[in-house]
Swiss-Prot record:
It is found in: Cytoplasm. This is Acetyl-coenzyme A carboxylase carboxyl transferase subunit alpha. It holds the Pfam family ACCA. The keyword Metal-binding does not apply. It catalyses: N(6)-carboxybiotinyl-L-lysyl-[protein] + acetyl-CoA = N(6)-biotinyl-L-lysyl-[protein] + malonyl-CoA. GO terms for cellular component: acetyl-CoA carboxylase complex. GO terms for biological process: fatty acid biosynthetic process; malonyl-CoA biosynthetic process. InterPro entries: Acetyl_CoA_COase_a_su (IPR001095), ClpP/crotonase-like_dom_sf (IPR029045), COA_CT_C (IPR011763). Residues 31-292 form the CoA carboxyltransferase C-terminal domain. GO terms for molecular function: acetyl-CoA carboxylase activity; ATP binding; carboxyl- or carbamoyltransferase activity. Its main location: cytoplasm. Its EC number is 2.1.3.15. Pathway: Lipid metabolism; malonyl-CoA biosynthesis; malonyl-CoA from acetyl-CoA: step 1/1.
Length: 319
């Protein structure tokens, strides 16, 4: 599933090309098989070396990889009996926001998540994962439905940010994101949020208030994109790598700062290389968290959720 390589993966791509070339050889010999084994070992070693030392800008590139698993991929691989629900009961159906009933092991759940699309046609229809106000209203309607039927809510976050167009602003983009966060803070059912790729600004926060907030190892969660930050501070997108380093939005920083509760380890070389393995890890994590949350009294759950987000950004200075 890896697909086109990233710029910093050139050596890995060369090894994979050599392996593929030898495997296509119809006249296989022990010498060729031995060479394939050696190249595979070299590939694994290079993947470990590369992915154990990604810089923040490289992490952004991995998070944006076109073959990275999206919300619908997790629905297909980790969940059963998904029934999609459409519309916001107000304006329309935003394809950048998926929602519906599903089963995860023994749990009946409501799944909500950003969707980017694979082909250009799909991406355009999904606005490249940038939801409009109707997308967030759609999410809120489905969350209230989940609360009514006492279903846990699982949110998959993967967006560069909320859609920035004039129509979205006219229909109350900022207000609806604030309303969604407010509603989620008091939703009387367990909520688990996972950043699976890009966690961009208010677009991510709009479905990001939960009892558990996790991030994939090579995802990022930020107040602004590196390009946006570079454009504001240095008037040029060329400084995006510098901005990425300054924003401290990678999984290790997020965990250390208390922005997320857990980091989900990705398969070697990133989630885009093995959708099935990543989906299995996701399923295990979600099932474990749901088992813990179902035992918690609702009042205590809401109190802990509220305190979790009240503490974000608080720091003490020594005089």
């Amino acid at each position: 599933m890896a697909g086109p390589g990233l710029e910093f993966e050139n050596e890995i791509a060369d090894l994979e090309e050599q392996i593929a070339s030898l495997e296509r050889n119809t006249d296989r010999s022990e010498e060729i098989d031995s060479a394939i084994r050696s190249l595979r070992l070299a590939r694994v070693a290079k993947l470990k070396e590369t992915y154990s030392s990604l810089d923040p800008w490289q992490t952004v590139q991995v998070a944006r990889h076109k073959n990275r698993p999206y919300t619908r991929d997790y629905l297909n691989l980790a969940f059963d009996e998904f029934v999609e629900l459409h519309g916001d009961k107000h304006f329309g159906d935003d394809r950048a926001m998926l929602s519906g009933f599903a089963k995860l092991d023994r749990f009946k759940v409501m799944v909500i998540g950003h969707q980017k699309g694979r082909t250009y046609k799909e991406r355009a229809a999904c606005h490249f994962g940038c939801a409009h106000p109707e997308g967030y209203r759609k999410a809120m309607v489905k969350m209230k439905m989940a609360e009514k039927y006492r279903l846990p809510v699982i949110c998959f976050i993967d967006t560069p940010g909320a859609y920035p167009g004039i129509g979205a602003e006219e229909r109350g983009q900022a207000q609806v994101i604030a309303e969604s966060m407010f509603m989620m803070s008091d939703l009387k059912t367990p909520v688990i949020c996972v950043v699976i790729g890009e966690g961009g600004s208010g677009g991510a926060l709009g479905i990001g208030v939960g009892d558990r907030v996790a991030v994939l190892q090579h995802a990022y969660y930020s107040v602004i994109s590196p390009e946006g930050c570079a454009g504001i501070l240095w008037k040029s997108h060329e400084h995006a790598p510098k901005a990425a380093a300054a924003l401290r939005f990678t999984s290790d920083h997020l965990l250390r700062l208390g922005v997320v509760d857990d980091v989900l380890e990705e398969p070697l070389g990133g989630a885009h290389r093995d959708h099935h393995q990543m989906a299995t890890r996701m399923k295990t994590y979600l099932s474990r968290q749901l088992s813990e949350l179902e035992e918690m009294p609702v009042d205590l759950m809401l109190e802990q959720r509220y305190e979790k987000f009240r503490k974000l950004g608080v720091f003490l200075e020594e005089s």
